[in-house]
Design a protein with these regions (language model features):
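Membrane-embedded alpha-helical segments of multi-pass transporters/permeases
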Residues: 28-36, 41, 53, 95, ...
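Hydrophobic transmembrane alpha-helices of multi-pass small-molecule transporters
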Residues: 28, 65-68, 91-98, 118-126, ...
Length: 205
């Protein structure tokens, strides 16, 4: 990563980061789609209501992933004090939000305060990155669009938590989008898997 930054390999960084964004994006959707069934199956049906906090937790993970993109640029430019300052600011905000929200709405509020904290941290690191390096390393349009769609899907999964058909329909649509978006990559991976299987069969014979 840092070698690419040094060499200004912006196209490579941009394409790799977009792929990572999409992988984490579909991973988050997959996790909170199957969460209600997994909780009932492996934990206890009495904890089924806990499944409603899985979508916001996954959304928080997505924003956590995004801020690391901007963090890498800041770290490359040795802006350690700036990085530390942003972490402290976000930690204080998170503590205050938790103190207020948990007392009012209960433990589930912690999942939403975490989202807010990571979103703030993401924004801080983005502007911190732009302050030290004006190079366009990331596709901001993709980042914003994926974030917006994931927020809407998160809300839909919380609202329709008890509707298995709606949840899995959203997952199916999201999966189709990924397959279309990375059709050539999926085909390439599929062909590589077939080649490896064929090689192993030859070796076994």
């Amino acid at each position: 990563m840092y070698r690419r930054i040094e060499n200004k390999e912006t196209d490579s960084i941009k394409e790799n980061s977009k792929l990572i964004m999409h992988i984490v994006w579909i991973f988050c959707i997959g996790i909170f789609t199957v969460a209600p069934e997994l909780i009932k199956l492996f934990i206890n049906a009495g904890y089924a209501e806990a499944s409603v906090i899985v979508p916001p937790i996954c959304l928080g993970i997505f924003f956590q992933m995004m801020y690391t993109f901007f963090y890498d640029i800041e770290y490359y430019h040795k802006k350690n004090k700036q990085i530390a300052l942003f972490s402290v600011i976000t930690a204080v905000i998170n503590i205050v939000l938790n103190y207020v929200a948990i007392h009012i709405w209960g433990y589930q509020a912690a999942a939403y305060t975490t989202i807010i904290s990571y979103m703030i941290l993401c924004v801080l690191h983005y502007f911190g990155m732009k302050k030290v390096d004006k190079t366009q390393y990331y596709d901001l349009k993709t980042l914003i669009s994926l974030s917006a769609v994931l927020i809407m899907i998160t809300i839909a999964n919380v609202v329709f938590n008890n509707s298995i058909w709606i949840r899995y329909a959203i997952l199916l649509d999201s999966g189709i989008y990924i397959l279309i978006r990375y059709k050539s990559l999926v085909i390439s991976l599929y062909n590589n898997i077939l080649e490896k299987i064929a090689e192993r069969k030859k070796q076994s014979n």
